[in-house]
Amino acid sequence: MRVDLNCDLGEAFGNYSFGGDHQIIPLITSANVACGFHAGDENVMNETVKLAKAHNVAVGAHPGLPDLKGFGRRNIDISNDEIYNLMIYQLGALQGFCRIHQLKINHVKPHGALYQMGAKDREIANVIAQAVYDFDPSLVLVGLANSYLISEAKNVGLITASEVFADRRYEDDGQLVSRKESDAVITDTDEALKQVLKMVKENKVISKNNKEVTLQADTICVHGDGEHALLFVSKIREILMKEGIDIQSL
């Protein structure tokens, strides 16, 4: 049994910094690097790619909507052409920094509202997937398990990785509970660990209404901007190793 452990990183911007990237990155196998639209900038991207290489961590693109103030978590009325173009633009930016460090982008995981839009809207998911395929058909598209991001990526011919979340609660249909709700984020370490083991070992998660939902767990996400991110990552890694589960990049 194997699973990838990923984290969204490189989300500082200019003089604004948060998250414990330097402490987290040695503990994970895949880094989703912000590409400048929702967070990150040219200096942060370069430093994050360099850091990932130093720790032999797979580098993935983490493109988002152009919404720095909202951290890419607010829905924006945007056309399919704009979605396609912003995907290509951000992938190209990260590819430049990967190239100077003799690395290759390994995977793509949309951020925040763009991720949720693709998970719930088949047409948007197809646009995202097509952009990734056109940029590089060998890339892995990471998306919410059982969502349109996964099915549409497969339809266009991409390799996929179904993602589950250690620090988020689930609806009965397998979607994530909206961050607008007070109970959307899991802050208790024991609860997060229990959820992770059930998802990885049983391919199931218990929804907020106590319903058992089936899902595929190829990669586990912990949000790098979370208050307990470093603690969660270290404890998840520890318990996976204790259970004999291999932690490998996608």
Swiss-Prot record:
Transmembrane segments: none
Pfam families reported in the protein's UniProt record: LamB_YcsF
Domain of life: Bacteria
SUPFAM superfamilies: Glycoside hydrolase/deacetylase
Swiss-Prot/TrEMBL keywords: ATP-binding, Hydrolase, Nucleotide-binding
Family: Belongs to the LamB/PxpA family.
Subunit and interaction comment: Forms a complex composed of PxpA, PxpB and PxpC.
Chain's role: Catalyzes the cleavage of 5-oxoproline to form L-glutamate coupled to the hydrolysis of ATP to ADP and inorganic phosphate.
Protein name, entry field: 5-oxoprolinase subunit A
Protein source organism: Staphylococcus aureus (strain JH9)
Organism lineage: Bacteria, Bacillati, Bacillota, Bacilli, Bacillales
